[in-house]
Regions:
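Conserved small/polar residues in nucleotide/adenosyl-binding loops
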Residues: 177-179
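Short glycine-aspartate micro-motif
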Residues: 67-71, 122-125, 162-165
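A short acidic Gly-Thr/Ser loop motif
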Residues: 70-75, 128-129, 167-171
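Phosphate/diphosphate-binding loops
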Residues: 156-157
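Phosphate/pyrophosphate-binding loops at sites that engage ATP/ADP/AMP, CoA/4′-phosphopantetheine
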Residues: 108-122
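Acidic, glycine/GT-rich loop-and beta-edge segments that sit at the periphery of enzyme/chaperone cores
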Residues: 2-65, 173
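Phosphate- and other anionic-substrate recognition elements at nucleic-acid/protein interfaces
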Residues: 101, 105-108, 125-134, 146-147, ...
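Short glycine-rich, Thr/Ser-proximal phosphate-binding strand/loop in the N-terminal lobe
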Residues: 70-110
Length: 179
């Protein structure tokens, strides 16, 4: 807005005065209660969630069909290959440095360098901030809304999941599930 005014001049003294005085901002922030009432409650939560682990196998010894998932987030890109039995065979996590497509291409090249004979990527899906870009640019089979992807993942571990908290690179989302 200031740039739209012609010939707006401010002396150095005036600029210093403006910078030294506190900026008054009038707004209200609605705050939530803490997620955990106590440290003990937090550790109980951690203990319960640590019981659910994704089984992991070595991609180099795997034979069969795999599924490729890509989460092109606003700050990081994640990729995974999952076997027919739900085991994690490959994972990739990297800051995308403002280039989710370039980072995803890097991940795909890494996958193909490691992909053994007898392994076939039969389905691919993207999600996240760059979901549509990645799906279109790399001609993936489908794209999925990030919150729906979170639900599928959470329901894999707990079919009765009723709350998902996503703390992402640029925002936070709380999903309450009612079925």
């Amino acid at each position: 807005a200031l740039n739209s005014k012609k010939d707006l001049r401010v002396s150095l003294q005036e600029m210093q005065n403006r910078l030294e005085n506190k900026i008054k901002m009038d707004f209200e922030v609605e705050r939530m209660e803490p997620l955990f009432a106590s440290e003990a409650e937090y550790y109980t939560f951690k203990e319960r969630h640590d019981k659910h682990q994704v089984p992991v196998k070595d991609l180099s010894t795997y034979h069969g069909k795999v599924f490729l998932g890509i989460d092109a987030g606003s700050t990081t890109t994640k990729a995974a290959l999952v076997g027919e039995d739900g085991t994690l065979l490959y994972s990739f996590y990297h800051n995308n440095d403002g280039d989710p497509l370039g980072t995803t291409i890097h991940a795909i090249k890494d996958i193909y360098r490691q992909l053994p004979e007898g392994v076939e990527i039969v389905h691919s899906c993207s999600t996240g901030y760059g979901e549509a870009l990645i799906k279109s640019a790399l001609m993936l089979d489908e794209g999925e809304v990030e919150t729906v992807s979170h639900y599928y993942a959470a329901a894999f571990f707990d079919p009765e999941v009723d709350c998902i908290l996503d703390i992402g690179g640029q925002d936070m989302k709380l999903s309450l599930i009612h079925i």
